[in-house]
């Protein structure tokens, strides 16, 4: 599947928010977004007011970029969310939160979701004892995610986990840093995700 290969810092500036796409750099003064909090391009400083459609589009793009999902797959998640009980926008975010690459990032086993995808593809994780190398695999409440033995020696995982322990872990996850494994306890509530997005705009975008 196609992947974005351009500047990650440019994406944060485009969406006017820090999306933590580059790992440790995002937590330092070297972060490009901290130095230039305006959209990229010649008219970035003076970008005009967006139309309703423009606002809806930007919100969709923002969530896609946060989770590293391409358009076709994102739309599939949305269609799945519409068939679930509850609020469609919240259902969409909960589906994205269940992605294995996202869960690994949330558990602190990777600096960002991009790195988590790479680690999953290289076979460094098991779910309930079985190796899974598909980043989009949807984790279920009660699932146990563990790093394989060879992965436990990787410095990038050790460094990431150390930083995550300092920041703290999401309340819907249990992480055993010493054994390098975690449990997806339950689905997160909307307010627990701490995502500065307006998911209702995405619902409106696809409802046209």
UniProtKB/Swiss-Prot annotation:
Q: Which SMART domains match?
A: Ribosomal_S4, S4
* Keyword vocabulary terms for this entry: Ribonucleoprotein, Ribosomal protein, RNA-binding, rRNA-binding
Q: Which SUPFAM superfamilies match?
A: Alpha-L RNA-binding motif (SSF55174)
Molecular function terms from GO: rRNA binding; structural constituent of ribosome
**UniProt domain S4 RNA-binding: residue ranges:** 98-161
Q: Which GO terms describe its biological process?
A: ribosomal small subunit biogenesis; translation
GO CC terms in record: small ribosomal subunit
UniProt cross-references to PROSITE patterns, sorted A to Z: S4 (PS50889)
Q: Does the keyword RNA-binding apply?
A: yes
- Pfam families referenced in this protein's UniProt entry, alphabetically: Ribosomal_S4, S4
The UniProt function text for this chain reads:
One of the primary rRNA binding proteins, it binds directly to 16S rRNA where it nucleates assembly of the body of the 30S subunit.
Q: Which HAMAP family match?
A: Ribosomal_uS4_B (MF_01306_B)
- Summarize subunit and interaction data from the UniProt record for this chain: Part of the 30S ribosomal subunit. Contacts protein S5. The interaction surface between S4 and S5 is involved in control of translational fidelity.
**NCBIfam families documented for this protein:** PRK05327.1, rpsD_bact
Record family assignment: Belongs to the universal ribosomal protein uS4 family.
Q: What name has this protein been given in UniProt? A: Small ribosomal subunit protein uS4
- What is the organism of origin for this protein? Thermodesulfovibrio yellowstonii (strain ATCC 51303 / DSM 11347 / YP87)
Task: State which gene encodes it.
Answer: rpsD
